C-alpha cells in the first residue's frame, strides 16, 4: 500500500498550500587579487531560479583593476557544482555595473551554480568588487 503524505494530510483536514519558492538577494564579495589571468579564490555560488530562467548578476564597486578594462575585461566562469559548464552564458564586461545572465540549461530547482571571476590574461592588475545576484 502506497501512502501519500498529501492524502494523509487531507484526511486529517490539513490543506496544503504550496508557494512558489523565492530567493532573497545575495551580496557576495569576491576578489581576484593577482595580475593577469587570476581567478577569484572565492567562488560565487547561487541557486538557479525555479525554472532555470536567467538570474541577473550585478558587478559593482570595481577597484584596483587594470587601467584598460576595455582591452582586458573581466570574465566569469560559470560551472555547476559538479564542475560542468553552465549553458546559455551571456555577459557584459568592463568597469562599473555589468550584467551576466545565465541559464542552467537544466531547469531544475535547487541546482547550484558557481561563478569564479577571472581577470584577463593581459591584465596588469587584480580586481576587487561586489557581486549582487537578483533572481
Language-model segments: which ranges?
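N-terminal prepro-regions of secreted/extracellular proteins
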Residues: 1-48
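Edge beta-strands of jelly-roll/beta-sandwich modules across compartments, strongly enriched
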Residues: 68-72, 112, 121-135
Amino acid at each position: 500500500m502506497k501512502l501519500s503524505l498529501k492524502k494523509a494530510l487531507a484526511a486529517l483536514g490539513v490543506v496544503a498550500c504550496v508557494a512558489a519558492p523565492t530567493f532573497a538577494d545575495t551580496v557576495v564579495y569576491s576578489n581576484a587579487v593577482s595580475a593577469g589571468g587570476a581567478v577569484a579564490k572565492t567562488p560565487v555560488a547561487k541557486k538557479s531560479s525555479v525554472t532555470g530562467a536567467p538570474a541577473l548578476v550585478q558587478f559593482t564597486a570595481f577597484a584596483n583593476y587594470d587601467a584598460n578594462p576595455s582591452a582586458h575585461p573581466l570574465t566569469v566562469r560559470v560551472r555547476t557544482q559538479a564542475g560542468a559548464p553552465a549553458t546559455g552564458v551571456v555577459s557584459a564586461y568592463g568597469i562599473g555595473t555589468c550584467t551576466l545572465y545565465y541559464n542552467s540549461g537544466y531547469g531544475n530547482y535547487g541546482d547550484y551554480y558557481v561563478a569564479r571571476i577571472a581577470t584577463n590574461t593581459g591584465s596588469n592588475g587584480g580586481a576587487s568588487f561586489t557581486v549582487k545576484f537578483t533572481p
